[in-house]
Curated annotation (Swiss-Prot):
It comes from the Eukaryota. Keywords: DNA-binding, Fertilization, Nucleus, Transcription, Transcription regulation. Residues 60-117 bind DNA. InterPro entries: MATalpha_HMGbox (IPR006856). The gene is MAT1. Its main location: nucleus. The keyword DNA-binding applies. It holds the Pfam family MATalpha_HMGbox. GO terms for cellular component: nucleus. The keyword Transmembrane helix does not apply. It is found in: Nucleus. This is Mating-type protein MAT-1. It comes from Cochliobolus sativus (Common root rot and spot blotch fungus). The lineage of its organism: Eukaryota, Fungi, Dikarya, Ascomycota, Pezizomycotina. Transmembrane segments: none annotated.
Length: 378
């Protein structure tokens, strides 16, 4: 028989760490003494958290901030840009970026913010707040004065879209540059930001950064001259693209209108059930459109038939005396079984028996035609 033994402290700790919340509540209820409950509660407070058997998924490395994205985030707040949505301003921001003389500073600022974000998270390191602190420190133009400082003019085209322009001989292209003639490192930017209360939770390591900026005034002037030429070429290219786009739109509209006209003509032809005239080089310029005239000369057969059916036949009793060998229709000497059409030489009132008015010229087309019941006796 196995002897009972007390569990070790490690076994008790492992048992407690693997219990659920409901099981822990049940254990607390089983402890009756207040002192024991207090000791057990204190033990739970310092106990290590339960380890899950599932391996932790390594966090994917985040992509560093792009210099142009930072530039756009800061200068999209230019007050004159407020009436238009972002999709209308993308081309303008691109033109400003191409001519901006401070690209190196924007590339430098992207590195410290990416480092801070990777350590403490994006929520604890707002990008717009970072630029509001660092850009004035590096003497970059603020959004409200950027266009004026660099000599840009904002206008609206015929379609209501914003456009910007700057003359090629503008004197403003060489101004508005930041502190590009002094050595600035990533650590310097982070330290300055933390001195103003930004990203207090970030811990700067002691390893020096290899990213810094140090340029002379001459290199800055060379860059500004290059920016002038780039701006001039970019403005001309943008204007040329604008003209080409309008020409394409006008051409598409012309084709669309021609299609509408052809469709309308076809609908008219279909409505009148007419076929378009054939087009052939061998077709004569003029052809006869006179319809053939039908032969309307009197026909003796049909004229006689109409007269026979429409003329009145003698109907009176006294009329029989005027005809040779004529009998009355009700003569007693006639056989009652003989059909009247086989009897020769009698007179009768044919119009009173059958209406032959349908055979008259110009008669009513709705008149009832006669029914020849004795046609089978012929």
């Amino acid at each position: 028989m196995a002897l009972a033994r007390d569990p070790t402290g490690a076994e008790i700790a492992r048992f407690i760490a693997t219990r659920t919340g409901a099981q822990m509540v049940q254990l607390m209820r089983c402890i009756k003494e207040p002192a024991a409950q207090a000791a057990f509660t204190a033990k739970l407070l310092v106990a290590p958290p339960a380890m899950s058997g599932r391996p932790a998924t390594p966090e994917k490395a985040r992509k560093a901030l792009n210099a142009f994205v930072g530039f756009r985030c800061y200068y999209i707040t230019i007050p004159m840009f407020k009436p238009w949505p972002m999709k209308k301003l993308s081309n303008l921001i691109g033109l400003l970026w191409e001519a901006d003389p401070n690209k190196s500073l924007w590339s430098l600022m992207a590195k410290p913010w990416s480092t801070i974000r990777d350590q403490i998270g994006k929520d604890q390191a707002p990008l717009d707040q970072f630029f509001r602190i660092i850009c004035p420190h590096l003497k970059l133009p603020d959004p409200a004065s950027y266009l004026e400082i660099h000599g840009w003019t904002l206008a609206v085209n015929e379609e209501g879209d914003p456009i910007i322009s700057r003359s090629a001989d503008s004197e403003f292209a060489s101004v508005g540059t930041g502190n590009t003639d002094m050595a600035i490192s990533v650590e310097d930017i982070i330290t300055y930001g933390q001195s103003l209360g930004y990203a207090h939770g970030f811990i700067l390591d002691n390893k020096p950064s290899s990213t810094f900026l140090g340029q002379s005034v001459s290199s800055t002037l060379e860059k500004n001259i290059s920016a002038i030429s780039i701006t001039e070429g970019t403005s001309k290219a943008a204007h040329a693209r604008f003209l080409i786009r309008n020409k394409r739109r006008a051409k598409r509209q012309t084709l669309r209108n021609a299609g509408y006209r052809a469709s309308l003509d076809q609908d008219i032809l279909n409505g009148h059930q007419l076929d378009p005239a054939p087009v052939d080089e061998n077709m004569p310029d003029c052809y006869s459109t006179t319809a053939p005239v039908l032969d309307q000369s009197p026909n003796k057969f049909y004229g006689g038939l109409t007269t026979l059916l429409s003329d009145q036949i003698s109907t009176g009793q006294g009329d029989a005396d005027h005809l040779d060998n004529a009998y009355l229709f009700n003569d007693c000497s006639l056989s009652g079984n003989a059909p009247f059409m086989t009897i020769a030489g009698f007179t009768t009132n044919m119009p009173n028996l059958t209406d032959y008015g349908a055979f008259r010229l110009g008669a009513d087309e709705d008149v009832t035609l006669p029914i020849f019941d004795d046609i089978t006796h012929i």
